[in-house]
């Protein structure tokens, strides 16, 4: 990957030293006890007092190792232990044992884990306290509007620290009382990633600008799907691939003010499209995250492309494209270099990870420092993107890379940051709600039986409502 010329090393050194001062230290941090375990909107004052600096063990909860990899690479002083679940950290704030508690998000397991440990955090022993946990946009408000997360300004972050972030990433974690309860190192606009070799065969070109002309709206996208089928390819891998382009463009939330579930017209458009693609053989009949879906992204795959946001390209698609998972990431290993991206038929976003400080943490200054280093500094953001191709949460850094000679070897020399920078401006989270992850998953699961012809659309809808109210007993199915 060709990197822009920058004095990143100096910037990193300065960032690490300055953040220690900005977030305080163990000698100067105030320690005030008391907290409420009631799960309701809490005030900034409540958040401010429910944290101390007495700890020597840092416990971090997450659902995969993405944040863990960022922490290890870009936060100074970490040494891994005998296995990946633990390590030691030594810096100006002290010496700490770091424990990684990773619970996969399948079947809501990660949220269930948080719901088990967070209410007990105030009374947990020092070495068992949750200090930090990660959340996703689909359920962020559930924790943001609770007494389990702390106001990041009460931790020590300032408006100036937060000024470089994309506004939507702050809105996602803004509580009803106006306090900011989480920060992210990444922004996650979405694009359409396609196989260059397949695009050449189907469209006669692999140039992103020309491919985009052929995929600029859903009618054009459908027409290319038919062309791809005639050439022996699938347009998409499975039932779920285009879901986020519809679910992130809804006109209403999943749940109305009366706690009644409502299905937006955009969601039904996805259902109709996916049924058509399934019946006509435009998709390969896979499900998101299954082995066949992953295999379709490799050298034996026959799929034109995948809808992916930022993390998906560098964290998932790249890995799935390699024949030798342990080999070098370069042209010649699988289909590395045979990918490109374009805007696709609709603007959308997908996912993202936010760092939250847990109420009751006894490592207040350390948590603040981690947030500041990994999410607030332009030089760190630039370095992460240059190294990993992730799209980081700093407007200045990303605009600079977008205008530079930055290139991704994985994407055949394309500067995908330029496209992501434009897509990020179009992100709309106005209809995000606390039930999004669970209802999205239940709806997709219920409709799979309709796509495969096992049940009618009406029966699939009924199955969805049944699963939804079982998962969320406080919700109602429409009468």
Where are these regions (language model features)?
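Extracytoplasmic/periplasmic substrate-recognition and gating elements
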Residues: 56, 119, 279, 324-393
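Short helix-initiation/N-cap motifs at beta->coil->alpha
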Residues: 102-116, 216-220, 285-299
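Conserved C-terminal helix/tail region of periplasmic/extracytoplasmic solute-binding proteins
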Residues: 396-412, 417-479
């Amino acid at each position: 990957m060709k990197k822009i010329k920058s004095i990143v090393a100096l910037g990193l050194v300065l960032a690490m030293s300055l953040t220690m001062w900005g977030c305080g230290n163990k000698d100067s941090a105030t320690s005030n006890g008391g907290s409420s375990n009631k799960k309701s909107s809490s005030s900034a004052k409540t958040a401010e007092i429910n944290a101390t600096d007495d700890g020597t063990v840092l416990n971090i909860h997450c659902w995969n190792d993405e944040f863990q990899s960022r922490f290890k690479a870009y936060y100074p002083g970490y040494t891994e232990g005998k296995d990946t679940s633990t390590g030691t950290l030594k810096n100006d704030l002290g010496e700490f044992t770091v424990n990684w508690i990773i619970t996969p998000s399948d079947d809501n397991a990660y949220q269930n884990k948080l719901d088990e440990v967070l209410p007990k955090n105030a009374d947990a022993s020092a070495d068992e306290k949750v200090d930090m946990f990660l959340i996703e946009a689909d359920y962020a408000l559930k924790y943001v509007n609770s007494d389990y997360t702390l106001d990041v300004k009460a931790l020590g972050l300032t408006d100036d620290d937060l000024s470089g972030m994309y506004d939507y990433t702050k809105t996602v974690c803004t509580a009803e009382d106006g306090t900011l309860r989480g920060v992210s190192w990444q922004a996650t606009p979405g694009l359409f990633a396609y196989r260059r070799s397949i695009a050449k065969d189907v469209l006669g070109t692999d140039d992103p600008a020309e491919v985009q002309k052929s995929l600029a709206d859903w009618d054009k996208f459908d027409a290319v799907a038919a062309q791809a089928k005639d050439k022996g390819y699938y347009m998409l891998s499975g039932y779920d691939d285009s879901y986020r382009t519809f679910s992130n463009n809804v006109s209403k939330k999943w749940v109305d003010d009366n706690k009644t579930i409502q299905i937006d017209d955009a969601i039904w458009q996805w259902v109709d499209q996916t049924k058509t693609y399934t019946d006509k053989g435009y998709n390969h009949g896979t499900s998101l995250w299954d082995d066949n879906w992953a295999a379709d992204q490799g050298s034996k795959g026959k799929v034109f492309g995948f809808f992916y946001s930022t993390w998906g390209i560098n964290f998932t698609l790249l890995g799935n494209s390699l024949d030798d998972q342990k080999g070098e990431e370069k042209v010649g290993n699988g289909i590395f270099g045979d990918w490109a991206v374009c805007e696709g038929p609709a603007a959308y976003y997908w996912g993202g990870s936010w760092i939250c400080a847990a109420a009751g943490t006894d490592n207040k200054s350390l948590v603040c420092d981690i947030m500041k280093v990994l999410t607030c500094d332009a030089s760190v953001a630039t370095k992460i993107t240059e190294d990993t191709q992730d799209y980081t949460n700093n407007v200045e850094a990303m605009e600079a890379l977008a205008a530079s000679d930055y290139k991704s070897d994985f994407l055949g020399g394309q500067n995908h940051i330029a496209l992501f920078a434009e897509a990020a401006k179009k992100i709309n989270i106005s209809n995000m709600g606390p039930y999004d992850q669970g209802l999205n998953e239940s709806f997709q699961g219920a409709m799979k039986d309709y796509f495969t012809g096992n049940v009618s659309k009406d029966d699939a809808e009924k199955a969805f409502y049944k699963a939804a109210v079982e998962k969320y007993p406080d919700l109602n199915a429409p009468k």
